[in-house]
Amino acid sequence: MSYNPYAYATSEQNGVNDRFSHTPQQQRPMQIPRNTPVNGQGNANMNANVNGSGGGFPFQDPRGSMAFQLGQSAFSNFIGQDNFNQFQETVNKATANAAGSQQISTYFQVSTRYVINKLKLILVPFLNGTKNWQRIMDSGNFLPPRDDVNSPDMYMPIMGLVTYILIWNTQQGLKGSFNPEDLYYKLSSTLAFVCLDLLILKLGLYLLIDSKIPSFSLVELLCYVGYKFVPLILAQLLTNVTMPFNLNILIKFYLFIAFGVFLLRSVKFNLLSRSGAEDDDIHVSISKSTVKKCNYFLFVYGFIWQNVLMWLMG
């Protein structure tokens, strides 16, 4: 007869088992072994073991591995060596322009409060005074639009362009003369007017301002040029409102004049603030004659040219 060690269980142990068998389901506390590390020590030890495994070899760059070289050679053979070289140049240029793309992304950092204040600044620029138009600098860089209402942005010009085209499309549909080809013509003509406006502003500042003096970037000028869609949209909506003809003309005239004041002060004050007064590397100041020429140019550009351009676009 074989020996059974469980046959000699004591009555005390049987009593304990019976007691637990008649007791409702109880949750026993989980016991953590003494040798088990707590919290992140286990992960740290595990990472240390993983990093230290393999005989202590350091992590190698995957570009120097045999698999990467084989894949690179196979890809170059598949698309051709010339195409592969062109692909590498494109990737290098995209990597080099990463910093520039990050700078462009700052022009889209807007908030609801900024958009409302910017609309007030465009429609009622007289309430902002004549000294509150300069952008705010912090650590040598301008603050993003969400922190400075005087900072230009790309959000409002892009949304203004889309809204302007959609409103024009809706008006054509209400008249019963909608045509998809006209939509393409309107979009292309609007973009052509914007490019022409940008070219005139950039060329005028280039001829008047010394090249040693820092001026606006092309993106910043595009932002200021794109703000014209705010009065254009309101002028479009006025055509569907029943009112006296003289009142309609008066409101449109005010919108165009207000935009001219906004454009004149925004470009003027921020252009003169970049004359090197706070820059140690540039010791060139704008002469009084240059300031007068800039004022004359911005006056003609903001009040005369903008009215003619918006009349053609509207």
UniProtKB/Swiss-Prot annotation:
Instruction: Give the transmembrane ranges.
Output: 154-174, 189-209, 218-238, 244-264, 294-313
Spell out the residue ranges making up region: Disordered: 9-32
Matches recorded under Pfam families: YIF1 (PF03878)
Cytoplasmic-facing ranges: 2-153, 210-217, 265-293
Polar residues composition-biased segments:
10-32
Please give the biological process terms from Gene Ontology that the record holds.
endoplasmic reticulum to Golgi vesicle-mediated transport; protein transport
Cellular localisation = Endoplasmic reticulum membrane; Golgi apparatus membrane; Cytoplasmic vesicle, COPII-coated vesicle
Which UniProt keywords are given for this protein, alphabetically ordered?
Answer: Acetylation, Cytoplasmic vesicle, Endoplasmic reticulum, ER-Golgi transport, Golgi apparatus, Membrane, Protein transport, Transmembrane, Transmembrane helix, Transport
**Is-annotated flag, keyword Transmembrane?**
yes
List of residues that carry N-acetylserine = 2
Residue ranges, Lumenal side: 175-188, 239-243, 314
How does it sit in the bilayer?
Answer: Multi-pass membrane protein
Gene Ontology CC terms, in alphabetical order: COPII-coated ER to Golgi transport vesicle; endoplasmic reticulum membrane; endoplasmic reticulum-Golgi intermediate compartment; Golgi membrane
The superkingdom of the source organism is Eukaryota
Q: Name the job this protein performs.
A: Required for fusion of ER-derived vesicles with the Golgi during ER-to-Golgi protein transport. May be involved in proper membrane localization of Rab GTPases.
The record's similarity note reads: Belongs to the YIF1 family.
Assembly and binders: Component of the YIP1-YIF1 complex, composed of at least YIF1, YIP1 and YOS1. The complex interacts with the ER to Golgi SNAREs BOS1 and SEC22. Interacts with the YIP1 family members YIP4 and YIP5, and with the Rab GTPases SEC4, YPT1, YPT6, YPT7, YPT10, YPT11, YPT31, YPT32 and YPT52. Interacts with BTN2 and SNX3.
User: Under which name does UniProt file this protein?
Assistant: Protein transport protein YIF1
Organism lineage reads as: Eukaryota, Fungi, Dikarya, Ascomycota, Saccharomycotina
